[in-house]
């Protein structure tokens, strides 16, 4: 089994982002990616990852108003994992590598192939795209980040476009907007990291909360969902060999 600890915060209390790669234990096993709802922990990361690697995982494919989903049950005999959610539902479209192999409404045990733990800042120092969007009044434009990664083994590049936030812009300001936005994001983007969670996340440490980063606390972490980019690679391979190399920005008028 592979285990991986990614420390993006060194404080005594942190937010634990846990993701598993598992394989069903049946005659036609499906490969699954499972992420646990984030939780707060003060346990040393090296100890927590050992406990996380020794749990039992059961999954069942179900249908929900949000589409195909996986109900996950994690069983552990360790009291040290009391803070970790043990029953939760995740999106099957992100989780499943080969959905045709997963039976419907059948509870199936899984073998853990890899486990990743990322230590983020405490909950009050984390911000998501949804948090920012809710605070935008009368938005007119979207800020899109084009995140570039390089596989240092193959030298191949991957560009992942991701929505950051909506903003309200007057027409007379459009000519200078892109330069301003790039300047505001420049320092933060140099601190960007990718982590395995619900596929992949981009974690940006915010050094300045002016302009596009308004409403974010300085030195907090801004979390951006990049999607299901771990389907064909292991947790360890991506986090070790995918390096963030650059980010460009596009300012797009909102579509009706």
Curated annotation (Swiss-Prot):
Post-translational modification: Phosphorylation is important for oligomerization.
Cellular component, GO, one term: viral envelope
Protein name: Matrix protein
GO biological process, one term: virion assembly
A GO term for molecular function: structural constituent of virion
InterPro entries, per database record: Matrix_Pneumo_C (IPR055461), MATRX_N_pneumovirus (IPR005056), Pneu_matrix_N (IPR043062)
Nuclear targeting and binding to host importin KPNB1: annotated segments: 110-183
Placement of sequence motif Nuclear export signal: 194-206
Main location: virion
Pfam family, one: Matrix_Pneumo_N
Keywords: Host cell membrane, Host cytoplasm, Host membrane, Host nucleus, Host-virus interaction, Membrane, Phosphoprotein, Viral matrix protein, Virion
In-chain residues carrying the UniProt-annotated modification Phosphothreonine: 205
Family: Belongs to the pneumovirinae M protein family.
Annotated source species: Human respiratory syncytial virus
Protein function: Plays a crucial role in virus assembly into filaments and budding. Early in infection, localizes in the nucleus where it inhibits host cell transcription through direct binding to host chromatin. Later in infection, traffics to the cytoplasm through the action of host CRM1 to associate with inclusion bodies, the site of viral transcription and replication. During virus assembly and budding, acts as a bridge between the nucleocapsid and the lipid bilayer. Also plays a role in the inhibition of host interferon-beta response in a RACK1-dependent manner.
Subcellular location: Virion; Host cytoplasm; Host nucleus; Host cell membrane
Record membrane topology: Peripheral membrane protein
Subunit and partners: Forms dimers. Forms higher-order oligomers. Interacts with glycoprotein G (via N-terminus). Interacts with protein M2-1; this interaction directs the matrix protein localization to cytoplasmic inclusions comprising viral proteins L, N, P, and M2-1 and mediates the matrix protein association with the nucleocapsid. Interacts with host importin KPNB1; this interaction mediates nuclear import of the matrix protein early during infection. Interacts with host AP3M1; this interaction plays an essential role in trafficking the matrix protein in host cells.
Region (Interaction with M2-1): 1-110
Gene: M
UniProt keyword Hydrolase, yes or no: no
